Regions:
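Hydrophobic alpha-helical segments, chiefly the membrane-spanning helices
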Residues: 1-309
Length: 309
C-alpha cells in the first residue's frame, strides 16, 4: 500500500530498505552469539543477497516477462546505472579485502573498513538521489516503443491509509528484528545439524528476507513492468551492501572477533561472471528467454556450490 501510494521508484526503495533492516538484524544477532564461524556471516549474507537479486530475481523476472511477451523491455540508462553501483559496492567491500595486505587473511584494517563503510554509504545515498530526484525518469517502466508505462488503473490509497500502513510497517520491522534473536540461532543450528557448510547460513538468511522482493518483482514482470522488477532487484542489492556493511562496520567496534569480508576464489569467479553477464543483459534495454536462462543458471550454480563447495 505504501509503495502504491508513493509510486515508482520510491516504492521499490521502501521495500529494499525494509528488507535490509531485517537482514541486518539477523546478521547482528548471529554475530552477537559469537563463535569462530560468526566472523564470515556478514560476508556470506551480503554476497548471497547480491547473487539472489542479480541472478535469481532478475532471471525469474525476465523469464516471466519473456514467456508473457517474448521480449522484456526496460530502461537501459537506469538499469545500467544501478548495475554499475552494485558492481562497485561489491568490489569495494567483498573483493578488495581478499587482496589487501594490511592484515592476514581476507580482512580490512580498521582504517580500510572505515573507508569502505563511508564509501558504501555515500554511494548508496548518491544512487538514491539520482533514482528519486535527478533522473527519476530513468527508473520508470517503459513500453516496447520506449514510452513510459501509464499509471496503474487502481486508485492509490488515501493518505490516511498510507500513514497507517507506514506505522504498521515500522511496528512489524521492530517485531521481526526482535524475533531475529530467536530465529538466528535456529537457522545456525539447522545448518549445522544438516552437515552443510557455514556459508549456507548466509544463503538461508538472504533467501528468507528477499522473498517479499522476489514476489513483488515477479508480479511486476507479469504486469509488463520489467523496470520495476529490476529496480527491486538491483535496489535490494545496493541497499544490502550500502547499508549492511556500514552498520556491521560500526558494530564491529563493540563486537569481539574478526570481521571477514573477502570472498574466496570460487565466489570471486561467480561475482565476476555475474557482473559481465548482467552488463550484457541491461545494456541493450531488451532481453529474451536466453538471458533469463543464463541468469537462472548462474543462480543455480551459486546455490549448488554453496551446498557443495
Amino acid at each position: 500500500m505504501i509503495a502504491h501510494r508513493v509510486g515508482e521508484p520510491f516504492g521499490s526503495l521502501v521495500l529494499a530498505v525494509a528488507v535490509t533492516v531485517i537482514e541486518v538484524g539477523l546478521i547482528v544477532m548471529l554475530m552477537v552469539s559469537g563463535g569462530d564461524k560468526a566472523a564470515s556471516y556478514a560476508r556470506d549474507t551480503v554476497f548471497a543477497a547480491v547473487m539472489i537479486t542479480c541472478n535469481g530475481i532478475v532471471g525469474l523476472s525476465l523469464l516471466v516477462a519473456t514467456l508473457r511477451g517474448r521480449v522484456a523491455v526496460f530502461n537501459a540508462e537506469g538499469s545500467g546505472g544501478a548495475l554499475a553501483t552494485v558492481t562497485t559496492l561489491a568490489t569495494t567491500t567483498l573483493v578488495l579485502p581478499a587482496f589487501t595486505t594490511g592484515t592476514p587473511g581476507p580482512e580490512f584494517t580498521g582504517a580500510q573498513l572505515a573507508f569502505a563503510a563511508v564509501a558504501s554509504l555515500s554511494l548508496y545515498g548518491l544512487f538514491v538521489t539520482v533514482q528519486t530526484v535527478r533522473h527519476r525518469e530513468y527508473f520508470l517502466p517503459v513500453t516496447a516503443e520506449g514510452r513510459p508505462v501509464g499509471p496503474s488503473v487502481h486508485a492509490p490509497p488515501t493518505r490516511t491509509a498510507a500513514r497507517w500502513s507506514l506505522g504498521l510497517l515500522a511496528a512489524a520491522l521492530v517485531a521481526v528484528v526482535g524475533l531475529a534473536k530467536l530465529v538466528s540461532p535456529a537457522i545456525e543450528s539447522g545448518v549445522r545439524t544438516a552437515g552443510l557448510p557455514t556459508a549456507v547460513v548466509g544463503v538461508a538468511i538472504a533467501l528468507m528476507v528477499l522473498l517479499p522482493e522476489t514476489l513483488a518483482a515477479v508480479r511486476a514482470a507479469r504486469g509488463g513492468r520489467v523496470q520495476t522488477s529490476l529496480n527491486l532487484a538491483y535496489g535490494s542489492a545496493i541497499a544490502s551492501i550500502g547499508l549492511t556493511v556500514p552498520t556491521i562496520a560500526l558494530l564491529s567496534v563493540w563486537l569481539s572477533g574478526p570481521l571477514v569480508l573477502g570472498l574466496g576464489p570460487v565466489h570471486l569467479v561467480l561475482l565476476a561472471l555475474t557482473a559481465l553477464v548482467s552488463a550484457l543483459t541491461v545494456v541493450p534495454g531488451r532481453a529474451t528467454l536466453l538471458q533469463s536462462g543464463v541468469h537462472l543458471l548462474l543462480f543455480a550454480a551459486f546455490v549448488f556450490l554453496s551446498i557443495s563447495p
